[in-house]
């Protein structure tokens, strides 16, 4: 069987880009059990309530839901267990410093396969207030309307 290459998406956390200002992103590996890998191969995971936390100089992923493998037996994993993330020591130290600074958190953005290994994209983020969310939504709508109008003008269809 040929080795997998490229990036194949498993799950996205679309809500994170709405709820947080993304400052920086990192790619990390995950320490998984066999049944978790099989469940991910089936494309089943949810990042919605997930977050990462620093504990004893390591970064742990919490609340990411990987459902039990349907064909698994008593060896199945707990769906919301905490999972260790694999990063370089320098990246871990940098993240520890930035998250202890205050107001910053680590949120998962995407879970995907890269060259046959499960990877997670995490973001260093700052939470948005509700008025910031409304402002960002209004800006996005205005930009979309401008782009539509420019498209109409280029095509020669004026209102």
Swiss-Prot record:
SUPFAM superfamilies, alphabetized: Small protein B (SmpB)
One Gene Ontology cellular component: cytosol
Database matches in CDD domains: SmpB
Main location: cytoplasm
MF annotations from Gene Ontology: RNA binding
Record's subcellular location: Cytoplasm
InterPro entries per record: SmpB (IPR023620), SsrA-bd_prot (IPR000037), SsrA-bd_prot_CS (IPR020081)
Annotated Pfam families: SmpB
GO-annotated biological processes: trans-translation
Keywords associated with the record: Cytoplasm, RNA-binding
Role this protein plays: Required for rescue of stalled ribosomes mediated by trans-translation. Binds to transfer-messenger RNA (tmRNA), required for stable association of tmRNA with ribosomes. tmRNA and SmpB together mimic tRNA shape, replacing the anticodon stem-loop with SmpB. tmRNA is encoded by the ssrA gene; the 2 termini fold to resemble tRNA(Ala) and it encodes a 'tag peptide', a short internal open reading frame. During trans-translation Ala-aminoacylated tmRNA acts like a tRNA, entering the A-site of stalled ribosomes, displacing the stalled mRNA.
UniProt family annotation: Belongs to the SmpB family.
Entry protein name: SsrA-binding protein
Organism, scientific name: Frankia alni (strain DSM 45986 / CECT 9034 / ACN14a)
Gene label: smpB
């Amino acid at each position: 069987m040929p080795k997998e290459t490229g990036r194949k998406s498993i799950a996205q956390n679309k809500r994170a880009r709405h709820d947080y200002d993304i400052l920086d992103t990192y790619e990390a590996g995950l320490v998984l059990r066999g049944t978790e890998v099989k469940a991910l191969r089936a494309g089943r995971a949810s990042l919605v309530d997930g977050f990462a936390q620093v504990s004893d100089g390591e970064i742990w992923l919490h609340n990411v839901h990987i459902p039990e493998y349907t064909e698994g037996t008593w060896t199945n994993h707990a769906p919301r267990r905490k999972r260790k993330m694999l990063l370089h020591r320098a990246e871990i130290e940098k993240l520890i410093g930035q998250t202890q600074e205050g107001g910053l958190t680590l949120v998962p953005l995407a879970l995907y396969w890269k060259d046959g290994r499960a990877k997670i994209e995490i973001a260093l983020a700052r939470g948005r207030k509700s008025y910031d969310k409304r402002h960002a939504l209004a800006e996005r709508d205005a930009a979309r309307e401008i782009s539509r109008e420019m498209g109409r003008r280029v095509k020669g269809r004026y209102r």
